């Protein structure tokens, strides 16, 4: 009898331990558990995806899906691929409607919308202009002559492309598109949407510096994004960031000339071209960071605002509650300062905010 009682007590203790262990496991799994980082290459740059989830993450399967998405987008919008959708459209010299994929149409439609909002300072028809200045898949060499720039300007202008019922039409047979200023942002949005529809909530997606995120990071806090400090001397190299953004779910993109430039006969030129004058911009704006709901919108606005003075950009954004911007400026005295438009939470800025 004593043996049976002892056995019963031991059995009950083990059951209690199992139940307690199960409860502890359940509590643990209710919190963000598994954390993964996926890296790869796309659109001539790199991408990083971070996921925090309380469910099993099939990393290889997710990476395969992400790579498939990005390969498809690259095949649609890469001007470096002669067989891409955009390259074929650029060779099309007809005024008849041209059938395009849904995603390609969406990006072009958004580009034209942004062109109208910025009075043409964002222009996706600058393919030949960029090539003339040494950018793009078939760059020319040397500083171009003004007559050649003026000749190309007769072929550019967003008014030369029409979106209608899923097709594109050219008003000028020689018009050519370049979507590099908006395609990376669109790629971020598409990957982000794929992860959300796959059931993930704590996500961080970055392609070439353009980011979109939601939920919480690996430390169970809001995601943070560093604001890159443009390098112009040895002191700048010691201070890689000029501030940190700590916003809840949003999309962020930055445009600046320090990342992409070309050396033409000893002259260093940034890749941001004024689409109206045809010349690289000369400005006291060092960089523009834009925050909005979609990364495509942030990407496009950042490029557009980089072509303008701060006063012009702030005037256009005034009253636009869906877009916020941070300008890093160089003052007349050579000192840097920050100015902003919209609702922005910037932490630890190293320059004055004016």
Q: Language model features by range: what are they?
A:
Residues 17-26:
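Bacterial N-terminal signal peptides
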């Amino acid at each position: 009898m004593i043996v049976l009682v002892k056995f019963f007590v031991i059995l009950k203790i083990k059951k209690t331990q199992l139940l307690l262990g199960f409860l502890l496991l359940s509590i643990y799994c209710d919190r963000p558990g598994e954390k993964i980082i996926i890296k790869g290459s796309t659109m001539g740059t790199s991408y990083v995806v971070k996921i925090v989830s309380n469910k099993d993450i099939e990393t290889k399967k997710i990476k395969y899906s992400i790579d498939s998405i990005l390969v498809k987008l690259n095949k649609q919008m890469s001007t470096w691929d002669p067989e891409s959708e955009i390259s074929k459209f650029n060779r099309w010299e007809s005024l008849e409607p041209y059938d395009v994929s849904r995603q390609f149409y969406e990006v072009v439609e958004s580009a034209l919308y942004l062109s109208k909002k910025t009075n043409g300072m964002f222009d996706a028809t600058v393919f030949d202009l960029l090539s003339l200045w040494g950018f793009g898949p078939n760059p020319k060499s040397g500083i171009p002559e003004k007559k050649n720039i003026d000749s190309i300007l007769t072929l550019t202008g967003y008014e030369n492309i029409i979106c209608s019922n899923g097709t594109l039409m050219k008003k000028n047979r020689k018009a050519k598109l370049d979507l590099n200023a908006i395609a990376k942002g669109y790629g971020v949005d598409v990957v982000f949407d794929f992860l959300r529809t796959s059931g993930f909530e704590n996500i961080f997606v970055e392609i070439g510096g353009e980011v979109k995120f939601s939920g919480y990071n690996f430390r169970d806090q809001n995601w943070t994004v560093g604001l890159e400090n443009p390098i112009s001397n040895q002191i700048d190299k010691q201070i890689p960031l000029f501030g940190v953004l700590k916003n809840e779910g949003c999309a962020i993109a930055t445009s600046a000339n320090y990342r992409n430039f070309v050396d033409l006969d000893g002259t260093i030129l940034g890749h941001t071209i004024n689409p109206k004058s045809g010349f690289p911009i000369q400005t006291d704006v060092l960089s523009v960071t834009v925050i909005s709901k979609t990364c495509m919108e942030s990407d496009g606005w950042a490029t557009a605002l980089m072509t303008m003075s701060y006063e012009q950009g702030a005037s256009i954004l005034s009253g636009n509650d869906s877009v916020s911007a941070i300008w890093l400026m160089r003052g007349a005295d050579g000192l840097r300062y920050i100015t902003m438009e919209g609702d922005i939470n910037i932490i630890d800025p190293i320059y004055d905010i004016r």
